Every structure is written in structure tokens, then in C-alpha cells.
Amino acid sequence: MSAIKVFILSDSIGETAHNVALAAAAQFSDYDIRYQRFPFVRTDSLLQTVLSQALKEHAAIFHTFVDRRLSQIVNQFCEAHELPYYDVITPALDTFSQITHVQPSNHPGTVHALNTNYFDRINAIEFAVTYDDGKNPSGFLEADVVLLGVSRTSKTPLSLYLANRNLKVANLPLVPQAQIPDEIWKVDPKKIFGLTNDPEKLNDIRRQRMVQYGLNPDTMYSNTDKIKAELEYADKIFKKIGCLVINVANKSIEETATLITESLNTDDTNNG
């Protein structure tokens, strides 16, 4: 089967439409879906050029135009030429108009404006990089979230994902022979999250990691008995701290992050 082509059109950067398309496409993993992004489409002439190309290549269209007129042009073109399309933003704008009884401002890219929220996110990302992998124990006392876990339990990618939600995250790998920094015991246990995994899953992940490095996959690093010992050690630490433990086996980064933020929000509500 030939690849499915999806055009992402927007009068801003198109990130929202792209993310929606990716989320939906994840349910169709057997298909080869290829995306082409067309950001900052704000003139009729440029829009018509892109639409003509979409028609020529039989591409589906996902779009976010806060300019209602451009949005209508796309929708009408797709309907007239029987091109599959999805208008990502218009229904949401209509819903908020109904709620507020106010028309949208129609300013493309407002969500990406350089506001306080943007700089907080940049600071959170810098924090995650600085305090990744237990580099500096002082970060544990400043963090909104502290992640603990043995090697290959998604600590670093999860830290960066949460940083994009403006949370300052520090993480620490748990190794049986290594001493736990004193700072960990001073952190509120509600801010600490223990990450674990199934031994078989972790064995597979570590073996793949060694293969990627061009090394023998059958080492002590991927040894099942050693992995079980590491997980047992980590579990003892989690119980001693009294933190929430999350098994990341078969969970996406997004799912794990949601469990963490929900736990934080619940604690905030209870303390409010």
C-alpha cells in the first residue's frame, strides 16, 4: 500500500494540528503516514497553491486557521474535491464563543506568544537538563517533582515532558551500591515518584540499548537476576520514602505524566 499523505496547514506554526493528527494516527500503526507541514499560510494565493498541491497528491488535510475566512476556504475546497480533511480549531473556537458570548480575537499564534508562561517553560526545561541523572543533589530541594528509578525507566524523557508543562523536575537513578543523597530524605514524599518496570520488559529494553551501541546485549546490565535485584532495592527505597510508585511498563510518557500531574493536583486540592 502506498503511503498516506497528510498536509498540515496553519496560519501559525501548525503544531496543534500536527499533534492531533499524530495522536489519531497512533491508532493506525500498520499504515505508512507521511506528514508535510505548511505553516504561516496567511494569504489566499499561498493557500490556493497548497490546496492545489494537496489535490494533486491526494493528501488529507488537518488545519488550524483562526482566520475564519481561510478556514472556510479550506473546508469548501476539500468538500468540493472530496479530499478528507479535519478542521481542528473552528469547533473549539465556536464552543468558547458560546460560553463567553464573545467572538475570538483571530490572532494567529497567540498560544506561542512570549509571555510569562513561555519563559517559565524554558526555565523548567533548563532545570530538567541541569538536574538530570542526579548531577546536582541540591536540585532535589528546588524541584516540583523528583523522579526515582533504576536505569531505563524513562526518567529523563519524562522529566523533559513534565518540564514542557512548566514543572521543575529532577531525577535520580537508583543503584544498589550507591548512596542516596541526604537531600532526598528532606523532600516532601508527595513530590517524589518512584518509577518501576516489569523485569522482562526492562531486560528487553536494556538488551536493545546495548545493540544500539553495537555491544553484546548479554551483559550484567541486561541480566534478569541483576534487574530483579535492582527493582527490589528500588522498591525498598520507595517504601521507605512513602512515595507514589508507577509501573511504566506498557505506559506512554504521556500516560505516566498524567498520573503524576493528577497526583500533584489532588494533593494541592486537599491542601487548599
Curated annotation (Swiss-Prot):
InterPro entries: Kinase-pyrophosphorylase, PPDK_reg. Its EC number is 2.7.11.32, 2.7.4.27. Transmembrane segments: none annotated. It catalyses: N(tele)-phospho-L-histidyl/L-threonyl-[pyruvate, phosphate dikinase] + ADP = N(tele)-phospho-L-histidyl/O-phospho-L-threonyl-[pyruvate, phosphate dikinase] + AMP + H(+); N(tele)-phospho-L-histidyl/O-phospho-L-threonyl-[pyruvate, phosphate dikinase] + phosphate + H(+) = N(tele)-phospho-L-histidyl/L-threonyl-[pyruvate, phosphate dikinase] + diphosphate. The keyword Disulfide bond does not apply. It is an enzyme of class 2 (transferase). It comes from the Bacteria. GO terms for molecular function: ADP binding; ATP binding; phosphotransferase activity, phosphate group as acceptor; protein serine/threonine kinase activity. The keyword Kinase applies. ADP binds at residues 149-156. Keywords: Kinase, Nucleotide-binding, Serine/threonine-protein kinase, Transferase. Bifunctional serine/threonine kinase and phosphorylase involved in the regulation of the pyruvate, phosphate dikinase (PPDK) by catalyzing its phosphorylation/dephosphorylation. Belongs to the pyruvate, phosphate/water dikinase regulatory protein family. PDRP subfamily. NCBIfam families: PRK05339.1. This is Putative pyruvate, phosphate dikinase regulatory protein.
